[in-house]
């Protein structure tokens, strides 16, 4: 990773102490700033250092599917459910549609989820990875926040990735400790571009094209990487003038399209004009 040593060291330092004190961290930043990359590197570190790593990611099309996010997260450890007290076991199984019970109280679900995680962590420390938390369903958001506030006595670390400047229920995660992820500085941006150019091959980019990409990307790692690749594919002939729009890729359009779609209708209308 380029420009993320401080954040990575913050995460791994906290993770090495979870046997004494568990914790949760919310990695907060703009689209494309590298939240997923940081979480992936942290998960790989944890996997190599004796942790069981559990993953989930919010999906925009599943925000109305109750408990979908936390079911994906804890599905691999559901074998520990029989060790829970009866009322917790029933609550959890009912929430996941695995028992014919009335939908339980959200508090009971939170307590049961915490109990399941603690039971699994008694055998091996856990690293819980929650990416794109802004797209979790409301019930999963409630559980993740509930559990994140109560990990101090468990050998568990929870990492959540959350987009900055959000409204709505996802902001409840901001009650947890935050780790802001900003843009890259000029040297880091140039280093990333050089690595992308080297990886893509071909004729690279002219100095003027490189300056244009760095200026428009403004330190956003995804923008730097994707604009560089798009320009190499298109060729420098696309750089007719400073007023010529840079070619983009589907990946970068998708990242910022989701941010656009999350805006209220009046704001979307204004930006579309």
Please identify what each model-predicted range represents.
Residues 16-17, 80, 99-101, 157-159, ...:
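Helix-loop-helix "sensor" segment of P-loop NTPases
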């Amino acid at each position: 990773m380029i420009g993320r040593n401080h954040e990575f060291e913050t995460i791994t330092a906290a993770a090495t102490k979870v046997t004494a004190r568990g914790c949760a961290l919310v990695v907060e930043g703009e689209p494309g700033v590298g939240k997923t990359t940081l979480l992936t590197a942290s998960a790989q570190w944890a996997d190599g250092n004796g942790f069981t790593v559990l993953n989930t990611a919010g999906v925009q099309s599943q925000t109305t599917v109750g408990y979908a996010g936390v079911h994906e997260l804890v599905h691999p450890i559901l074998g520990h459910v029989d060790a829970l007290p009866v009322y917790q076991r029933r609550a959890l199984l009912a929430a996941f549609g695995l028992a014919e019970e009335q939908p339980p109280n959200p508090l009971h679900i939170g307590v049961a989820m915490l109990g399941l995680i603690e039971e699994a962590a008694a055998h091996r420390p856990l690293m819980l990875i929650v990416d794109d938390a802004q797209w979790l369903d409301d019930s999963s958001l409630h559980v993740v926040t509930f559990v994140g506030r109560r990990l101090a006595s468990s050998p568990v670390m929870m990492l959540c990735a959350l987009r900055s400047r959000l409204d709505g229920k996802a902001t409840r995660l901001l009650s947890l400790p935050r780790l802001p992820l900003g843009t890259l500085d000029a040297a880091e941006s140039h280093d990333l571009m050089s690595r992308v150019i080297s990886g893509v091959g071909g004729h690279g980019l002219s100095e003027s094209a490189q300056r244009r990409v760095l200026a428009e990307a403004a330190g956003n790692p995804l923008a730097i990487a994707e604009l560089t690749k798009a320009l190499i594919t298109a060729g420098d002939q696309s750089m007719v003038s400073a007023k010529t729009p840079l070619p983009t890729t589907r990946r970068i359009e998708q990242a910022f399209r989701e941010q656009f779609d999350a805006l209220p209708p009046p704001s979307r209308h204004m930006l579309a004009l």
